[in-house]
Every structure is written in structure tokens, then in C-alpha cells.
Amino acid sequence: MEHIGFFPPHDGVSLRALAEHLGAELADEAFAGVIIKSIAPVYRAGDGDVCYLLSRKNRAELETCKASAIICLPTLSSLVPEHIPVLLSKKPHTDFALAGALLHPQAMRPVALTSTPTLISPTAFVDPTAKLEADVGVEPGAVVGPGAEIGEGTRIGAGAIIGPGVKIGRHCTIGGGASVLCSYLGNGVIIHNGARIGQDGFGYAPSPRGMIKIVQIGRVIIQDNVEIGANTTIDRGTMDDTVIGEGTKIDNQVQIGHNVRIGRYCAIVSQVGIAGSAVIGDGVQIGGHTGINGHIQIGDGVQIGAMSGVMNSIPAGERFAGIPARPLWDFLREAAEVAKRSGAREKKDGSAEHD
């Protein structure tokens, strides 16, 4: 089947201009005028495409590669066929991401559902007391509640709900069907389709008559340039705030409980659950399907492996994995020992069957 993308190619950027934009080195100036229009993987890259190379594993694909340029480490440039221009980079993955943003800026935000995303649809409802700055787009079926404030260049997707008094900064995108209640958002925030921000936290007091609801009167504070994936849920605080720090990226289907405080530039992969009042430091990376206990602290720069169960606080800079989570090398040694013993047992059982 022919590959037809939803994001049309760029009009074209010269390889010299792309190298300057990335701060990369063009290996051969004879290729300075080559025009780059899009990005693609090595195996599918064709005329006008740029791809990137991280290791020797793609060596076989390079033999048939038809890309117009390849971004790679200087130590790997000898693997690239002579007819393909090379951009030498110390950080090819990052530079490839920057190239994608340059060539496909429209893909940096959730897809607009109308051809006039900077206008207010006649089928949207915007309360008369709401304040919208210039160039705010509100797509069909969206609701902007009383007293809400929305900054310049922000787009509210179809069917989205912006609650009373919510403040949203400039150049944000709220995806279709998302809801934002009891929240303050900074600038450049992206919330993908179906996310739920600022609903009740899960708070109940046990009693002889059953569970008594604890009112949740806090807020959600989302700082600048945060991105929140589809169908992720972030509860508002009980009395204090739930806070997501600047530049943090949260994948799809993540649950963040009330009063959680997440630092800056964290990466949280899909299906992570963070229980109430946990404190996550700056630059933390959490693998998918991990559970974080409430009322614990995760230090700056911690890395947590996928499908871990974090019961206790973790000091800064550590790498943890497993259930319960423990230092990575302890987990790997234990896993190797279990595998070794299991293999020995299977070998013994097999020998017994042949006797």
C-alpha cells in the first residue's frame, strides 16, 4: 500500500540551512544545496527525506536507503553510502527530533478538527464572562465556562470543556473531548484528546456508616510547556495543589492522584499510576505500567524501570526496577539467579525423565 501521510511535506529546506539550524556539520559541502522536505525511517526514506542512524544495527538497511540525507555520529559516517549526504552530529536522535519540528510544525500540536482553528465556532459555547485574548480558536461543541481566561493563540478542541474560572496561558492546545476544571495552565501547554484535568481526587474517610467523601477543594497547576497524553487523568488537590512542573511530558493513560507534585522535565510513560501526595523530583523518568505509592519522595534524576512497584522513597540519581522496586543491579542479579536456578531445575527434571 502506498504510504500517504496526514502531514504534507515541507516546501523544502536546503541541507546547509538544516545543518545550521541543528548546529550539525555537513560532511561534504558539495551537497549543501540538497533540498530536504520531510523525515522518514532509514528503510523507507526516499528523495527529500532525512533519516538518522544511531548504531550499526541499521547497516543492512543502509544498502538500499534512498534518503537525501542521514544524521549520524561521526564514528558511524563510514557506514553511509557515498551518494547520501551526511550531517555529523553528537546527538543524532535529538537533532532528528528538531528536524521533524522544523519540517512539520503542524504536527507539534494535536490535529485541528476544523479548517478554521483560529476562529470561534458558532456551535461552541463561550460564557459572556469568559475572557479570550486574540487568535483564540474554539472548535465546534466546546464549552468555555464563566470567568475562564484563555491566552493568545490557544486552541480549544471540539467537544472540550473549560470549567469556570480556569486560566489557560498563551499558545496552548486543548485536544478534542478533553476537560479542564479547577486548573491554572501556563504557556505552551498541550493536552491531548480525552484527557481529564482537575476532577475530584479520590478521598474518603472510613466510618461505621461506610465511606465518607472528603471534599477536594484544591487546584491543578500545570507549568509552561507541559504535554499531557490522551486519556490521562490528573486529580485536583484535596486542599493543596496538584502540580506538574515545567517541561514535563506525560504519556497516554496515566493517572496522577491528588496533591501529587511532579518536578520539571520529567518523562512519565503510559499506564503509570501515582498515588496521592507523592513528590517527584526534577528530571525523573518512569517506565510504563509502574505504580508509585502515595506520600513518598522520588529524588531528582531517578530512573524507574517499566512495571515496577515503588513502595518507598528513592534517593536522587538512583535507578530502580522490580516489584517491590529496588536498585536496578540488585533486581538484575536476582532475576539472573532465578533464571539460573530455574534452568538448573529444568535440566535436572529432564535428566530424571530420561533415566
Swiss-Prot record:
Keyword annotations of the record: Acyltransferase, Lipid A biosynthesis, Lipid biosynthesis, Lipid metabolism, Repeat, Transferase
GO molecular function: N-acyltransferase activity
First and last residue of the signal peptide: none
HAMAP family associated with the record: LpxD (MF_00523)
Entry-linked InterPro entries: Hexapep, Hexapep_transf_CS, LpxD, Trimer_LpxA-like_sf, UDP_GlcNAc_AcTrfase_non-rep
PANTHER family (UniProt xref): UDP-3-O-ACYLGLUCOSAMINE N-ACYLTRANSFERASE, UDP-3-O-ACYLGLUCOSAMINE N-ACYLTRANSFERASE 1, MITOCHONDRIAL-RELATED
EC class name: transferase
Name recorded for this polypeptide: UDP-3-O-acylglucosamine N-acyltransferase
A UniProt-annotated Pfam family: Hexapep
Assembly notes: Homotrimer.
Coiled coil regions, renumbered to chain: none
Species the sequence originates in: Rhizobium rhizogenes (strain K84 / ATCC BAA-868)
Reaction(s) this enzyme catalyzes, per UniProt: a UDP-3-O-[(3R)-3-hydroxyacyl]-alpha-D-glucosamine + a (3R)-hydroxyacyl-[ACP] = a UDP-2-N,3-O-bis[(3R)-3-hydroxyacyl]-alpha-D-glucosamine + holo-[ACP] + H(+)
